Amino acid sequence: YDDFSFYSQSALKIRTKDGDIQPLKLKPAQRILHEAVEKQMASEGKVRIIILKARQQGLSTHVGGYLYFNVSQRKACKAMVITHHSDSTRALFDMTKRYHDNCPELLKPHTKYSSRRELTFDVLDSSFVVATAGGESIGRGETLTHVHASELAFWQKSTALENWNGMTQAVPSKPGTAIFVESTANGVSGIFYDLWKGAVDGTNGYVPVFIPWFLDPEYRETVPENFEPTPE
């Protein structure tokens, strides 16, 4: 089946800011991304999406869930997540490990190997691996089906392009594959800026998804009754 929205709230668990373990029910920002994924998959058979976002909107959570959904329910899939910092790499892998540990037994694939950076499902011949940008061989020699480039605007500038090329060249242009790029803004130059501009101009095959900060209810406060706006 392909209904990620149903799967996410039925099979995926997240840790909330209050420290509770709860089902992943898509929030407004996540639903915008979900709809963009569904639309591109329906029209092109694959996903190539770049996301310009605010912080704490749950978009890495959504992408991580989507990648786990695919590699844990399909044969011969390999997902790779690359972040800008080792702490972020560890956090995203821990999130995916939580998805796996809390997945209903009926849907949980048999695990052959699990480390601090990789989950391998031997019966499916699928796997999930994480890496930190800055190395020289990310994606080299791999065949990947799903990629998540996290905070691309903050990747180490000296190796960002090499890492990006190695990673994306490992993903064949075939139905069912997916490349997600997401980042907060970081100036008007660099690989993320160029990719975003190309997506907006319609020249590179990526769909631009801009999600404003005010869509998230947690960024809002109730206006006091005696509030008087100033000219500023």
Question: Can you name each region flagged by the protein language model?
Answer:
Residues 1-232:
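Phosphate/NTP-binding elements of NTP-utilizing enzymes
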